[in-house]
Design a protein with these regions (language model features):
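Terminal, low-structured helical/coil segments at or just beyond the last alpha-helical repeat
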Residues: 3-11, 19-35, 131-165
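Repeat-mediated protein-protein interaction surfaces in helical alpha-solenoids
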Residues: 19-37, 60-68, 96-98
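Alpha-helical segment of the N-proximal tetratricopeptide repeat
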Residues: 36-72
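Helix-start (N-cap) detector for alpha-helical repeat units in TPR-like alpha-solenoids
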Residues: 43, 77-78, 111-112, 145-146
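Canonical tetratricopeptide repeat
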Residues: 48, 82, 116, 150-154
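Structural signature of tandem alpha-helical TPR/SEL1-like repeats
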Residues: 55-68, 89-102, 124-136, 148, ...
Length: 165
């Protein structure tokens, strides 16, 4: 009767995989992963601070936090959007519009970027762009979105074919 070697081979394979994994982790180049984790932690912390400052209407502080987030991760559309809303709060509609547009270049379905782009465009007197961005927002937003009714009201208000008496 032959001895079944499959179990021994399986255990030897698993041990070899574990050993190779351990060696990879211990390589000199493994340090950046720890740095990436620290970087991610700072991004999360700064983003949360920015959101808190945004809600507290401390727009300058919020913008500073979002600028730091973008320095660490320039491809984060949420940070672009929130920087845009901070700039709107500071009365800087043109700069805000640029941040909303950058967010949409990174992620075309970033809904709050369309909303912010519409508000910024309206403040700049570009009602055609405001209507376009708000229509996109209203089209993509779920029915239960808390800002959808505001978007529909803005579209009604901005409609050039409706007489507002």
């Amino acid at each position: 009767m032959r001895k079944d070697l499959r179990i021994g081979a399986l255990l030897a394979t698993l041990a070899a995989i574990a050993l190779v994994g351990l060696l990879i982790v211990m390589l000199p180049g493994a340090g950046p992963r720890a740095t990436y984790g620290a970087k991610t932690g700072e991004i999360d912390e700064r983003f949360a601070q920015g959101v808190l400052m945004l809600h507290a209407k401390q727009y300058e502080h919020a913008l500073t936090a979002f600028h730091r987030v973008l320095a660490l991760d320039p491809a984060m559309p949420e940070a672009h959007v929130n920087a845009g809303f901070a700039l709107l709060g500071m009365g800087e509609a043109a700069a805000a519009r640029d941040f909303f547009a950058a967010a949409l270049e990174l992620r075309t379905r970033q809904l709050n970027a369309y909303y912010g782009l519409a508000v910024a465009s309206e403040q700049l007197g570009d009602l055609a762009a405001a209507r376009g961005a708000m229509r996109t927002y209203a089209h993509l937003a779920p029915r239960d979105d808390p800002f959808r009714r505001k978007a529909e009201a803005a579209l009604w208000e901005w409609d050039p074919g409706i007489s507002k008496k």
